């Protein structure tokens, strides 16, 4: 839970930087400072690298960078909790891809209903109070696709390279995103105040959550960890309400609940399959 709280706090803080350096500049801060922190911790230069590992590392890092860039752009117009819920459909799709039990299709139905409740599009107004910006929705869905690819590619990278893939992937992600940040924010990225906030975002959104998740994975069953991770949309909605004063309708809260239920159910049935096997 600590990792979820710090991650959501970091993302809420990130949104406060958007008026000054944009979503692109904020993403650049997060990835550059996260790279420096992870490099200092893992010291990947101790490992012997080969050129044959470069293609999969580039795919891994590029996917990570684009995922962060799309998600932060989604946050410009979509409430935090809803953006997380939409993005969650990516890993949920990966988890359900190989589903065979009839119960697994219940989680698919719940996720589809939840997305249906989120997706009223068009201009928000009296006749359409739950409407969301379609561009923001597209960004969040794109981030979900990247998250799904990140999981699939990440499994291969982890098997081949291990923990050193994390700092190297983050380095590639930073290299991919930095041109966008410079293009939008320019010299504003060198503002010391914004840089310090960017460092705080990297700590809260990457370094601290990653450390806590690594500790949790060592001390919690994988199924329990996955179920706790499913609480992220709710924590995000709460953080958005407390920090950003974002208000969600009852329909949108129900949508978040359905997607969370689908994610938890998928984690539980996956755990049962592993026990059976």
Question: Regions from the language model: what does each represent?
Answer:
Residues 51-55, 84-87, 97-121, 130-136, ...:
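Loop-to-transmembrane alpha-helix entry segments
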Residues 6, 42-83, 115-118, 202-220:
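Specific transmembrane alpha-helical segments of multi-pass solute transporters/efflux pumps
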Residues 29, 83-86, 153-174, 206-242:
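Helix-helix packing/entry segments at the starts of transmembrane helices
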Residues 20-66, 92-94, 110, 146-150, ...:
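Transmembrane alpha-helices of multi-pass small-molecule transport proteins
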Residues 1-25, 59-62, 66-70, 109-113, ...:
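Glycine-/small-residue-enriched transmembrane alpha-helix faces in small-molecule transporters
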Residues 25-35, 72-102, 143, 223-241:
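Specific alpha-helical transmembrane segments that line the substrate/conduction pathway
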Residues 31, 194, 230-277:
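C-terminal-most transmembrane helix of multi-pass membrane proteins
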Residues 1-2, 34-59, 100-106, 124-132, ...:
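Membrane-interface interhelical linkers
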């Amino acid at each position: 839970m600590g990792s979820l709280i710090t991650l959501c706090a970091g993302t809420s803080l990130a949104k406060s930087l958007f008026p000054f350096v944009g979503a692109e500049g904020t993403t650049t801060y997060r990835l550059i400072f996260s790279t420096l922190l992870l490099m200092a911790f893992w010291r990947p230069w101790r490992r012997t690298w080969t050129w044959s590992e470069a293609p999969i590392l580039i795919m891994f890092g590029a996917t990570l960078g684009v995922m962060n860039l799309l998600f932060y752009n989604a946050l410009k117009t979509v409430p935090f909790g809803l953006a997380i819920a939409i993005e969650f459909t990516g890993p949920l799709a990966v988890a359900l891809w190989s589903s065979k039990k009839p119960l697994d299709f219940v989680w698919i139905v719940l996720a589809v209903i939840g997305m249906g409740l989120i997706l009223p599009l068009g201009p928000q107004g009296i006749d359409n109070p739950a409407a969301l910006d379609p561009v923001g929705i597209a960004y969040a869905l794109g981030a979900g696709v990247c998250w799904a690819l990140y999981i699939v590619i990440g499994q291969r990278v982890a098997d081949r390279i291990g923990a050193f893939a994390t700092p190297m992937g983050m380095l590639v992600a930073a290299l991919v995103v930095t041109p966008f940040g410079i293009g939008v924010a320019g010299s504003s990225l060198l503002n010391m105040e914004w840089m310090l906030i960017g460092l705080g975002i990297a700590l809260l959104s990457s370094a601290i959550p990653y450390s806590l998740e690594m500790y949790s994975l060592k001390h919690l069953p994988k199924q329990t960890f996955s179920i706790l991770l499913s609480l992220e949309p709710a924590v995000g909605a709460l953080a958005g309400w407390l920090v950003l004063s974002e208000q969600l309708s009852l329909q949108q809260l129900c949508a978040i609940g359905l997607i969370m239920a689908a994610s938890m159910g998928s984690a539980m049935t996956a755990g049962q399959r592993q026990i059976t096997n």
